């Protein structure tokens, strides 16, 4: 048998054996490493900041040994039991060229997402365990010290919201300012640009993750809603990342 195939089988078996679901507040984030590659340096330079207006604070979704978060049941207050992990938070990133523009996708994980309407039936329809939000920062060249932000696309209540380029009031140096909020009209948590200062989380890029962590993020079913109505997917995972970049193209 081909040695490469054997190695891949062993890695997959090891991941399946070690990966386990743990409490949302027990997941240890990856410390932000010193960036080495051009891609990683650009991801750190343009790392966005996030203000929480409604709902949970971001939490790490996976840790080094592949253990994955169990999230939170979608009942109770929107920020119930999820106002921040004592172990620290996390922001994930993955980058690629799209039509000669460098795209850096950043993603945050939230233990739950739910509607604010108190009626039990409505809550069941719109509340769910796990939530992912992401923003794409489009720049001209990751190698240049004078790289310019050409545009920003973010996951919105419906589809995507974009600005090309973002207005100066929404940018602090090289960092886009975003707000995680609840859209009462559409009944969904999502991202929007804001003038307010937010917080930074330790960044880990897709390539910097351990193999076990990447395996868990790629193979976890994040959507526990009936018929996968929430459409929840880890935005950086293989098979999803490029598709989202193409759909969010703002130019």
UniProtKB/Swiss-Prot annotation:
Domain of life: Eukaryota
Cellular location(s): Secreted
Stored Pfam families: NPP1
Chain span(s) of sequence motif Hepta-peptide GHRHDWE motif: 127-133
Induction: Differentially expressed during the developmental and plant infection phases.
Record-linked InterPro entries: NPP1
Residues spanning the signal sequence: 1-19
Glycan-modified residues: 146, 218
One of the record's GO cellular component terms: extracellular region
Keywords in alphabetical order: Glycoprotein, Secreted, Signal, Virulence
Entry similarity comment: Belongs to the Necrosis inducing protein (NPP1) family.
Domain remark from Swiss-Prot or TrEMBL: Key residues/motif important for the effector activities are degenerated in most NLPs, including the nlp24 peptide consisting of the conserved region I (11-aa immunogenic part) and conserved region II (the heptapeptide GHRHDWE motif) that is important for phytotoxic activity.
Role of this protein: Secreted effector that contributes strongly to virulence during infection by P.capsici.
PANTHER family named in the record: DOMAIN PROTEIN, PUTATIVE (AFU_ORTHOLOGUE AFUA_5G00600)-RELATED
Protein's UniProt name: NLP effector protein Pc129485
């Amino acid at each position: 048998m081909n040695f490469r195939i054997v190695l891949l089988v062993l890695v997959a078996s090891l991941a399946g054996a070690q990966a386990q679901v743990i409490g949302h507040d027990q997941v240890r984030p990856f410390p932000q490493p010193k960036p080495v590659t051009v891609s990683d340096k650009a991801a750190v330079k343009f790392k966005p900041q996030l203000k929480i207006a409604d709902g949970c604070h971001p939490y790490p979704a996976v840790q080094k040994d592949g253990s994955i978060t169990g999230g939170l049941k979608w009942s109770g207050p929107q920020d119930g039991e999820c106002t921040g992990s004592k172990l620290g938070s996390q922001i994930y990133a993955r980058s690629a060229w799209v039509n000669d523009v460098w795209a850096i996708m950043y993603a945050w994980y939230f233990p739950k997402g739910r509607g604010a309407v108190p009626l039990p039936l409505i809550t069941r329809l719109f509340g769910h365990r796990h939530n992912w939000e992401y923003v794409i920062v489009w720049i001209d060249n990751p190698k240049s010290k004078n790289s310019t932000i050409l545009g920003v696309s973010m996951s919105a209540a419906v589809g995507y919201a974009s600005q090309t380029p973002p207005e100066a009031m929404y940018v602090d140096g090289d960092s886009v300012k975003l707000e995680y909020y609840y859209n009462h009209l559409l009944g969904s948590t999502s991202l929007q640009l804001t003038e307010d200062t937010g917080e930074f989380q330790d960044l880990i890029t897709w390539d910097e993750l351990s193999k076990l962590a990447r395996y868990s993020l790629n193979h976890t079913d994040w959507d526990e809603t009936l018929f996968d109505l929430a459409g929840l997917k880890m935005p950086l995972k293989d098979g999803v990342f490029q598709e989202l970049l193409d759909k969010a193209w703002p130019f």
